UniProtKB/Swiss-Prot annotation:
Function: NAD-binding protein involved in the addition of a carboxymethylaminomethyl (cmnm) group at the wobble position (U34) of certain tRNAs, forming tRNA-cmnm(5)s(2)U34.
Keywords, comma-separated and alphabetical: Cytoplasm, FAD, Flavoprotein, NAD, tRNA processing
InterPro entries cross-referenced by the UniProt entry: FAD/NAD-bd_sf, GIDA_C_N, MnmG, MnmG-rel, MnmG-rel_CS, MnmG_C, MnmG_C_subdom, MnmG_C_subdom_sf
Organism: Histophilus somni (strain 129Pt)
Protein's recorded name: tRNA uridine 5-carboxymethylaminomethyl modification enzyme MnmG
Length: 629
């Protein structure tokens, strides 16, 4: 039986990817349906109760710059905020928030339930309905079918999910939730490459049984940051500390003695786990020279007694988990309320996706989140946003959009996945971006908000505030450029008192601000340059743009050189086999990956510069040498 209403877009899954996808298409004024197996777990933080961090915070800011929800939810649920790498350059500074799980979930649900053009329906999806090679809808477990012009699948760890605790295992999407078995079977019948990955989570501890008095405290920043451009410190709930303990020789002995009961070390788990979030078993074996590992005890909320021990993710049996926990300082009498576990799940090779996250094999079907081989809430949300945007553009028969590597970390993430693929859970780092000085947290709105406005994602209030900020930046730069200080000025002595070397030539405000000993606050305390601008965000942009001008211009020149052929399009039906000069290996890889541009082709492992030159020559010969936008 078909549902009485038809939809433009159906989103399957109510996690971080699904919520951003559904909100994006609904904001684009498209009739959207979000299907979830449980409405009460919309926006659930399945693992660590935190948002942001190195690289991840950049993604959150980009999602926010394009009208997404994650930053706002973090601001309203964050119970400890910190700016990481605060002593380093602006490119690698990152915001991180410890979040209250309940508050976060509430913010997400309220946003979804109050979003125009968005319906929510609780039911497990068991099949994707296809006509030839195009998606036309979905079928649910109860037999009810829904028609749609496009479908976004954000299944997380639910596809054929299997939970492991010791040598025991059972089907599950995460603790307390069923796996999506039928849909996983149906998807395996499609012309898509599928494999298995693994992730894990630590046991949760009862805070009432922890001796916090003997543990080191970690407080958030005194000057609290915010995630959202439209956010404020006043939105933050009560701020509380985290605590720090350590593993020790006793902990490590317990782990080593019980490896024969570990599903990872006995071969029961075949999926590959996240490199940058290893289990405690992995850490003890891989870093055998270390006799201690730092463990952060992170509260799960203001109204919860659960504590998340960040650093002891494990799939060892429960009795071993108890010994591990009780071996650590402050946790000698601690009680576990939820056991840790590992989970294996299906993921699809992201090289079978276009850069829009639409599957190459099935028109109108988009994948986002862990189904594409990533790990992390932020990576999932970023993909959900992009998949939602492109599902919406697909329905409207408009040109698709995806950011370039020099435009956003979302662009880096998607290009890495779709070009190179991944055999282990992929996470974003600032080190993955070639042009990270341009991809800072602080300028995410400048990079992306104008684009998001054209896509229909930005409301009038945000747009007006964004334009005011841009105007403030330009006016202040003009003001600083127009004020000159010369060696005969009556203000010379005032300036020389703060300068490391006295003025010997005429300079303007921007020249002075470039000096390492001068910042905006110091500059605008000088009589000629008073008063300081009140817009703190605009001030930050003015200072960074001036101080890093040379470096920024150098990166922009590098981008222009790279762009010369980066966007040179390769036709979808281009015949690589008939190009003389390409090795069989290169030809096979190009046939397999089907890159859409020369830039994408150049990032495929094994594709040499010589092969790229041959490709360009042949594209020119065949009259196909066209540059993308």
């Amino acid at each position: 039986m078909f549902y009485t209403e038809n939809y433009d877009v159906i989103v399957i899954g109510g996690g971080h990817a699904g919520t951003e996808a559904a909100l994006a298409t609904a904001r684009m004024k498209l009739k959207t349906l979000l299907l979830t197996h449980n409405i009460d777990t919309l926006g659930q933080m399945s693992c660590n109760p935190a948002i942001g961090g190195i690289g991840k915070g950049h993604l959150v800011k980009e999602i926010d710059a394009m009208g997404g929800l994650m930053a706002t939810a973090a601001d309203k649920a964050g119970i400890q905020f910190r700016t990481l790498n605060s002593s380093k350059g602006p490119a690698v500074r990152a915001t991180r928030a410890q979040a209250d799980r309940v508050l976060y979930r509430q913010v997400v649900r309220i946003a979804l339930e109050n979003q125009p053009n968005l319906d929510i329906f609780q039911q497990e999806v068991t099949d994707i309905i296809l006509e030839k090679d195009s998606v036309t809808g979905i079928e649910t477990k109860m037999g009810l079918k829904f028609r749609a012009k496009s479908v976004v699948l954000t299944a997380g760890t639910f596809l054929a999910g299997k939970i492991h605790i010791g040598l025991e295992n059972y089907a599950g999407g995460r603790a307390g939730d069923p796996a999506s078995v039928n849909l996983a079977k149906k998807l395996r019948d499609l012309n898509l490459r599928v494999n298995r990955l693994k992730t894990g989570t630590p046991p949760r501890i009862d805070a009432r049984t922890i001796n916090f008095d003997i543990l080191a405290k970690q407080y958030g920043d005194e000057k609290l940051p915010v995630f959202s451009f439209m956010g404020s410190v006043e939105q933050h709930p009560e701020q509380i500390p985290c605590y720090i303990t350590h593993t020790n020789d006793q902990t490590h002995d317990v782990i080593r003695k019980n490896l024969d009961r570990s599903p990872m070390y006995t071969g029961v788990i075949e999926g590959i786990g996240p490199r940058y979030c290893p289990s405690i078993e992995d850490k003890v074996i891989r870093f055998s020279d270390r006799n201690s590992h730092q463990i952060y005890l992170e509260p799960e909320g203001l109204t919860s007694n659960e504590v998340y021990p960040n650093g002891i993710s494990t799939s060892l049996p429960f009795d071993v988990q108890m010994k591990i926990v009780n071996s650590m300082k402050g946790l000698e009498k601690a009680r576990i309320v939820k056991p840790g576990y590992a989970i294996e799940y299906d993921y699809f090779d992201p090289r079978d996706l276009k850069s829009t996250l639409e599957t190459k094999a099935i028109s109108g079907l988009f994948f986002a989140g862990q189904i594409n081989g990533t790990t992390g809430y932020e990576e999932a949300a970023a993909q959900g946003l992009l998949a939602g945007i492109n599902a919406g553009l697909f329905v409207q028969e408009k040109e698709s959009w995806f950011p370039r590597r020099d435009q956003a970390y979302i662009g880096v993430l998607v290009d890495d996945l779709c070009t190179v693929g991944t055999k282990e859970p992929y996470r974003v780092f600032t080190s993955r971006a070639e042009y990270r000085l341009l991809l800072r947290e602080d300028n995410a709105d400048i990079r992306l908000t104008s684009i998001a406005r054209k896509l229909g994602l930005i409301d009038d209030i945000r747009w007006a505030r964004f334009n005011q900020k841009m105007e403030n930046i330009e006016l202040e730069r003009q003001r600083l450029r127009s004020i000159w200080l010369h060696p005969r000025s009556e203000y010379l002595n005032e300036a020389n008192e703060i300068l490391k070397s006295p003025l010997i030539r005429e300079v303007n405000g921007e020249d002075l601000l470039r000096r390492p000993e001068i910042n905006y606050q110091i500059l605008t305390a000088l009589t000629p340059f008073k008063p300081a601008m009140e817009d703190k965000e605009a001030v930050e942009q003015v200072e960074i743009a001036i101080k890093y001008q040379g470096y920024i211009e150098h990166q922009q020149e590098e981008i222009e050189r790279q762009k010369r052929h980066e966007n040179t399009a390769i036709p979808a039906n281009f015949d690589y086999k008939n190009i003389s000069g390409l090795s069989n290996e290169v030809c096979a890889k190009l046939e397999q990956y089907r890159p859409i541009s020369i830039g994408q082709a150049s990032r495929i492992s094994g594709i040499t510069p010589a092969a790229i030159s041959i490709l360009l020559v042949n594209l020119k010969k065949q009259g196909m040498l066209k540059r993308g936008e």
